[in-house]
């Protein structure tokens, strides 16, 4: 008999068929076990779980006594209680490599659209405000040759540094737990303290995940150390930045502008002051949202689950100490 799994996000038909070759697939639209008796029953038998979103904590795991592996269609896993999973011997799989280039593209798009005021000015043209040759009140600022400061030199940070260095001749500064030799050799990047990064960067680009250590890492004190001409770009996790202090800094001119793909609360509330500011480009967490990359993420997650439940995992495991070997 095939192992039973719960699939709680729609995936392409060919990937669903790939899962079905190995497992009995129970498909659901999201994880709401309180309202879905069928889901509760499926979780009781499930050895595998695959999807994205939802809160996978100790209480949820009690509903799935036979679970051996969970595969998230994302690189982030802050909605999973990793400690609880590990205590149960459940492998947690994610997709850290397939979205790198696309997220770096998104960050460059945010840099360009924010610096050149693309969204704001496009809306003004649509509103019929372009009646004559534009004056300096419609001007933006250059991106090329400006200093980029990357907070978090991981895979996405490296891909962003490559674009900035080779595409826009930007000096690269970065802050991370340790120096990154490849970044320094390939892009002439300079490892520096957070204070130096804040003081010297024209674009502060945040790629950090959400952890206890990174929560509100950028707050009032840090924003005050930035150039008044600086632009903040966040495509890491919303809570890395104290959103209320960011709003104040954008309103009073402490910093020039912000391009944001992530927020403390998602979806962003319709009454958020961020939506009233002309110096903000806000997009709905589109970092990896292309047809190609989302397909590749789903395919990676499918392969991850197959590998985890067949004992053939070689990569992409968040808690490798519990890897299934049988």
UniProtKB/Swiss-Prot annotation:
SUPFAM superfamilies: Formate/glycerate dehydrogenase catalytic domain-like, NAD(P)-binding Rossmann-fold domains. This is Glyoxylate/hydroxypyruvate reductase B. Homodimer. It comes from Yersinia pestis bv. Antiqua (strain Nepal516). It holds the Pfam family 2-Hacid_dh. GO terms for cellular component: cytosol; plasma membrane. It catalyses: glycolate + NADP(+) = glyoxylate + NADPH + H(+); (R)-glycerate + NAD(+) = 3-hydroxypyruvate + NADH + H(+); (R)-glycerate + NADP(+) = 3-hydroxypyruvate + NADPH + H(+). HAMAP family: 2_Hacid_dh_C_GhrB.
């Amino acid at each position: 008999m095939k192992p039973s799994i719960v699939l709680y996000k729609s995936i392409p038909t060919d990937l669903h068929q790939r899962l079905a070759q190995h497992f009995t697939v129970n498909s659901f639209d999201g994880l709401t076990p309180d309202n879905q008796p069928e889901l509760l029953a499926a979780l009781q038998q499930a050895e595998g779980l695959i999807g994205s979103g939802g809160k996978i904590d100790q209480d949820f795991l009690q509903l799935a006594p036979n679970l051996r592996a969970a595969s998230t269609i994302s690189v982030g896993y802050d909605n999973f209680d990793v400690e609880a999973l590990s205590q149960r011997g459940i492998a947690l799989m994610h997709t850290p490599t397939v979205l790198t280039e696309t997220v770096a593209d998104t960050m460059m798009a945010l840099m360009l659209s924010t610096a050149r005021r693309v969204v704001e000015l496009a809306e003004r043209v649509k509103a019929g405000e372009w009646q004559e040759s534009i004056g300096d009140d419609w001007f933006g600022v250059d991106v090329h040759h400006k200093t980029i400061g990357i907070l978090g030199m991981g895979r996405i940070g490296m891909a962003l540094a490559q674009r900035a260095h080779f595409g826009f001749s930007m000096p690269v500064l970065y802050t991370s737990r340790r120096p990154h030799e490849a970044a320094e050799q390939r892009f002439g990047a300079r490892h520096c303290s957070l204070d130096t990064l804040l003081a010297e960067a024209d674009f502060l680009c945040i790629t950090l995940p959400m952890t206890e250590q990174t929560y509100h890492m950028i707050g009032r004190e840090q924003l005050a150390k930035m150039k008044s001409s600086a632009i903040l770009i966040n495509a890491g996790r919303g809570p890395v930045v104290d959103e209320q202090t960011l709003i104040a800094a954008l309103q009073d001119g402490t910093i020039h502008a912000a391009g944001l793909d992530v927020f403390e609360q998602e979806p962003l509330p319709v009454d958020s002051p961020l939506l009233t500011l002309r110096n903000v480009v806000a997009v709905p967490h589109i970092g990896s949202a292309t047809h190609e990359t989302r397909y590749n993420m789903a395919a990676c997650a499918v392969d991850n689950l197959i590998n985890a439940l067949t004992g053939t995992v070689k990569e992409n495991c968040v808690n490798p100490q519990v890897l299934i070997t049988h």
